[in-house]
């Protein structure tokens, strides 16, 4: 139009054009969730399960697909199994992110004794290669939920990477991720309990569509910026995160993790003691039962 300056209507028009290009894959996603083909929950709560947000390139556009991240935890010897890596579906940066989680768990919860834990992580219903560490905050929250037994809100999706001290780090495509989950929630019906947890470092980059802003202003959707995993846990659980340095405490998330790991440690000690001696009646020839 001969102008050299972009105005608000120009940006809105470009945004609508992008929305139209992504309409078909978005509609397929909504149908898959509605039919139960893709198991994504945006209501209720669950242990060891949280919604992450993955970005799929479509031409020059980024299409966001929610990814259900699940974790399990059991007695073990410090193993954290990255199922994406074990099946050659995880890239090196994603694998690095999972190794960072292992370091965080060991240093924060088990610095003075062996980590008596075996855990596994996977992005469910993903069949292509996963790269990047932007799911590591969600993965850590799922792991801590599995360990503590505290449920996570399924209406909150989580994006962000973490370092070995639990600090939440900025990620890419933050606007697309928020809007992608918002569109899914609109398709299922906004409940007022849905939203997205993002790194505080991304807050200055937000440029969201008007429909989403209106939903936030009317308390039908929310965007939460966090700087540490403990803040994300408090939002997802409704529990105080607590300080693991204070030991086992059934009233906080981290206190319950400490209690579970102490239980695992005692079980390992008992099993190690039982292996030291043969069971009664099973002494070998020339041996005397204790």
Label the model's feature ranges.
Residues 62-66:
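Short, flexible loop/turn motifs enriched in small residues
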Residues 2-36, 194-200:
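Conserved C-terminal helix/linker of AAA+ ATPases
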């Amino acid at each position: 139009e001969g102008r050299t300056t972009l105005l608000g209507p120009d940006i809105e028009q470009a945004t609508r054009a992008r929305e139209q290009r992504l309409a078909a894959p978005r509609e397929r996603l909504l149908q898959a969730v509605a039919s139960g083909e893709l198991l994504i929950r945006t209501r209720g709560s669950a242990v060891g399960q949280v919604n992450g947000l993955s970005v799929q390139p479509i031409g020059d556009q980024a299409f966001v697909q929610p990814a259900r991240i699940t974790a399990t935890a059991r007695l073990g010897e410090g193993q954290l199994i990255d199922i994406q890596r074990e099946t050659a579906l995880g890239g090196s940066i994603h694998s690095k992110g999972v190794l960072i989680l292992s370091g965080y768990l060991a240093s924060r919860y088990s610095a003075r004794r062996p980590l008596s834990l075996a855990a596994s992580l996977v992005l469910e219903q993903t069949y292509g290669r996963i790269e990047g560490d932007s799911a590591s905050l969600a993965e850590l929250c799922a792991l801590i939920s599995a360990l503590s037994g505290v449920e996570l809100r399924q209406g909150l999706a989580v994006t962000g990477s973490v370092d070995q001290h639990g600090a939440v780090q900025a990620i890419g495509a933050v606007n697309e991720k928020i809007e992608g989950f918002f569109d899914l929630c609109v398709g299922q019906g906004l409940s007022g309990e849905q939203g997205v947890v993002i790194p505080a470092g991304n807050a200055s980059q937000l440029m969201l569509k008007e429909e989403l802003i209106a939903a936030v202003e009317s308390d039908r959707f929310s965007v939460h910026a966090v700087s540490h995993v403990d803040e994300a846990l408090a939002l997802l659980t409704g529990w105080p995160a607590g300080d693991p340095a204070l030991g086992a405490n059934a009233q906080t998330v981290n206190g319950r993790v400490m209690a579970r790991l102490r239980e695992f440690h005692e079980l390992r000690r008992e099993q190690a003691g039982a292996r030291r001696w043969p069971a009664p009646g099973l002494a070998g020839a020339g041996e005397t039962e204790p």
